[in-house]
From Swiss-Prot:
This is 7,8-didemethyl-8-hydroxy-5-deazariboflavin synthase. Binds 1 [4Fe-4S] cluster. The cluster is coordinated with 3 cysteines and an exchangeable S-adenosyl-L-methionine. GO terms for molecular function: 4 iron, 4 sulfur cluster binding; 7,8-didemethyl-8-hydroxy-5-deazariboflavin synthase activity; iron ion binding; transferase activity, transferring alkyl or aryl (other than methyl) groups. Pfam families: Radical_SAM. The gene is cofG. Its EC number is 4.3.1.32. SMART domains: Elp3 (SM00729). Catalyzes the radical-mediated synthesis of 7,8-didemethyl-8-hydroxy-5-deazariboflavin from 5-amino-5-(4-hydroxybenzyl)-6-(D-ribitylimino)-5,6-dihydrouracil. Residues 4-239 form the Radical SAM core domain. Pathway: Cofactor biosynthesis; coenzyme F0 biosynthesis. The keyword Ribonucleoprotein does not apply. Its cofactor is [4Fe-4S] cluster. Consists of two subunits, CofG and CofH. Belongs to the radical SAM superfamily. CofG family.
Length: 324
């Protein structure tokens, strides 16, 4: 039987401030604020059974909000990256393996964060310019492609993906997947590709845009499986689709991070399913297996820093999956 993987995580949205203004986003906020170290510790303390600390938040807020920059300086940090690093270290101290998706980072910034991250991520979304990204400098395809390549040069286990239904066409989706495949052929660092469906959010410019159909999503998953190298997992977010089974039959083999203590702050209207419900959705045709935020292949290759070694050795089994 084929294996379907998932990770037990805790979601830490450090800030909703962001330099991008994407037409579909309901997460971004103008209210200046950042989670304190105490808040981060509190969330982590409540995260029973989780091994992954998922840090996802607005992109480069310190570059567009002078008040945000001033707040960081007052807290003793020169930049958001310095603050992220400190929060990553707290997570490691408390027994969690960080995965950071901070939006666009330079090669040097990723180099700085690498020792304290089991993996990192950045959605490609689409490799073409789209109207919904007109006010989002960080969503320029060439900027995102460069970062994904740079992560490969640094040998950082990496998550990327496509967002389906944001104004792109079928050919654009195929092109985006081909770009990811080409990067993987060169660097070998991409562990998973998320095929995510757009969901309209009230109060956004795209609130009346219809989401992609089930057929479009299944076709995108099939295309991803055909185009991407076999070692790359295809992830379908289980809280954004009604039934994961057809997607697994189409080629998906990962259901991402699942949390029993925090909700999906990007899609708050879509709660994560319980592991037991996921088990039932597999209909006895697949084996559900817990993994770490670093995939088994990279555990075996030791693509991680010394700071994470004790935790990875503690949490991983002989095959690189999470110990039961």
């Amino acid at each position: 039987m084929k294996i379907v993987t998932y990770s037990k995580n805790v979601f830490i949205p450090l800030t909703r401030n962001c330099r991008n203004r994407c037409d579909y986003c309901g997460f971004r906020s103008e209210e200046i604020g950042v989670m304190s170290a105490e808040e981060v510790r509190k969330i982590l303390s409540a995260a029973r059974g989780a091994k992954e600390a998922l840090f996802t938040f607005g992109e480069r807020p310190d570059e567009v909000y002078p008040e945000f920059k001033a707040m960081l300086l007052e807290m003793g940090y020169k930049s958001m990256v310095d603050y992220i690093l400190e929060m990553n270290k707290i997570a490691v101290e408390m027994g969690f393996l960080p995965h950071t998706n901070a939006g666009i980072l330079s090669k040097e910034e990723m180099r700085k964060l690498k020792p304290y991250n089991a993996s990192m991520g950045l959605m490609l979304e689409q490799a073409v310019e789209l109207e919904c990204h007109a006010n989002s400098p960080g969503k320029k395809p060439e900027v995102r492609i460069k970062m994904i390549r740079d992560a490969g040069k640094l040998q950082i286990p990496f998550t990327t993906g496509i967002l389906v239904g944001i104004g792109e066409g079928r050919e654009d989706r195929l092109y985006s997947l081909e770009i990811i495949a080409e990067i993987q052929d060169n660097y070998g660092h991409i562990q998973e590709v998320i095929v995510q469906n757009f969901k309209p959010k009230k109060g956004t410019p795209m609130e009346n845009t219809p989401p992609p159909t089930l057929e479009e999503m299944l076709e995108a998953v099939k295309a991803a499986r055909e185009i991407l190298p076999q070692e790359v997992a295809i992830q379908i977010p289980p809280n954004l689709v009604d039934d994961i089974y057809p997607f697994l039959k189409a080629g998906a083999n990962d259901v991402g991070g699942i949390s029993n203590v925090t909700h999906d702050y990007i899609n708050p209207e879509s709660p994560w399913p319980e592991v037991e419900r996921l088990e039932r959705a597999l209909r006895g045709e697949f084996i559900l297996k817990e993994r770490l935020p670093i995939y088994p292949r990279f555990v075996k290759l030791k693509w991680y820093g010394e700071a994470l070694e004790p935790l990875i050795e503690k949490y991983s089994d002989a095959d690189g999956y999470a110990r039961p």
